[in-house]
Structure formats: structure tokens, C-alpha cells
């Protein structure tokens, strides 16, 4: 799959939180924030895709929903990786592989 297509298929974890948890359960961002003991702006920014899910937020989401915190972090990590790989300004083309370095004799011990 082309990298640009991957970018179109990945959802921000906040969108998943909103579409698969909050809306079906009828929970507002305000109510979630209050129950989790975090500022409403934090959860609002996550739901709007302006902020990522941190370890602290993942633990709180896990406790609130009875889910594994790691699952929230995995969603964020997957999103971050795909976005980073598909950024048009990605500078990874300048990174040489270990094979390229050793074949060129540039590997310093």
C-alpha cells in the first residue's frame, strides 16, 4: 500500500475515542474529563486530534473504560508512526542503512 494511502486510512486516537466510545455511550468530553480528573481542554484537544494520548492519559482512559492502557498507547504509536512515515518533508532519505555504510567502508569502530 502506498504511504499516502496509509495516511488516509489511519485515524487519530481521539477520533476513535469519540466515535467508538464517547458517542455510543452518550458520554460528553466534559463528563469524561471530570471522571478522569483531567482538564477538559486536554480531552477536548485529544478528541479534536490536536493532542496525542500520553501514558498518563492512557492509564486514566484504561481505568475509566476498563481497558488496557497499552491499547490506547498502541493507537497513538501507530498513528504517530504512519504520520511520520508519510510526511512530505520526511528527511529519512538522508539516513543510510548499516549495509550502505559498511559496504562503503565508512563504518568506524
Which residues make up each language-model segment?
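A short, Lys/Arg-rich alpha-helix, primarily the initiator
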Residues: 2-27, 74
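Alpha-helical structural signal
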Residues: 18, 43-44, 69
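The alpha-helix within a helix-turn-helix
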Residues: 22, 33, 62
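Short alpha-helical DNA-recognition segment
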Residues: 26-45
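The DNA-recognition helices of helix-turn-helix-type DNA-binding domains
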Residues: 39, 50, 65, 76-79
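Base-recognition residues in the alpha-helical recognition helix of bacterial helix-turn-helix
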Residues: 45-48, 74
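Short, basic-rich loop-to-helix N-cap that marks the start of a DNA-contacting helix
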Residues: 50-63
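Short, charged recognition helix plus adjacent turn
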Residues: 73-109
